[in-house]
Design a protein with these regions (language model features):
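Conserved structural motif at the start of ABC-family nucleotide-binding domains
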Residues: 5, 19-22, 131
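The feature captures the beta-strand-to-loop junction immediately N-terminal to the Walker
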Residues: 36-38
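Helix-to-loop junction immediately C-terminal to a conserved catalytic motif
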Residues: 51
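Conserved ABC transporter NBD signature motif
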Residues: 56-71
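Conserved ABC ATPase "signature" region
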Residues: 112-130
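Conserved ABC ATPase signature
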Residues: 134-138, 142
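Hydrophobic anchor residue at the start of the ABC signature
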Residues: 148
């Protein structure tokens, strides 16, 4: 079975405290893996380091045998609520469309099929009726479903 994520000797700190120390693991294609632990154990920091949203002190991270930057389009991610600016003036459909920018291209207009893909993802999450609703006007659970739709529309190889 192919390795989709390989982490070796990963260490990172947060607020001058080392929270990850020599972390090693592999995730294989076709498997489901969970990251569990008590509050403050470093779960969120681990994900941020893997996605290059937080610097690592040492170690290597490979997605599909390459760097995250090169494999980014193959990875779907749902951010934690605290890392989203809920007052940013955008609607649910636009948030989901953001998941397609890797396919659309930088500074290009989305085509009709992109909107159809985004609407289908919203529909899968039971949120199609809220496509034009501002993200800030949704409940917390509805907001999370919109971000799940954004991850799903990417058609990623790793979520």
């Amino acid at each position: 079975m192919d390795i989709v994520l390989q982490v070796s000797g990963l260490s990172a700190s947060y607020l001058k405290n080392r929270v990850l120390d020599d972390v090693n693991f592999n995730i294989h294609a076709g498997t489901m893996t969970g990251i569990v632990g008590p509050n403050g154990a470093g779960k969120s920091t681990l994900l941020k380091v893997l996605l290059e949203l937080h610097p690592r002190l040492s170690g290597t991270v490979e997605f599909f045998g390459t760097t995250y930057r090169k494999a980014k389009s193959r990875v779907g991610y749902v951010p934690q609520r605290g890392s989203v600016d809920w007052d940013f003036p955008t609607n649910s459909l636009d948030v989901v469309m953001m998941g397609l920018y890797g396919q659309i291209g930088w500074l290009k207009w989305p085509r009709r099929r992109h909107k159809e893909l985004a609407m289908a993802a919203l529909d899968k999450m039971g949120m199609a009726d809220y496509a034009e609703r501002q993200i800030s006007q949704l409940s917390g659970g509805q907001q999370q479903r919109v971000f799940l739709a954004r991850a799903l529309v990417q058609d990623a190889d790793l979520y």
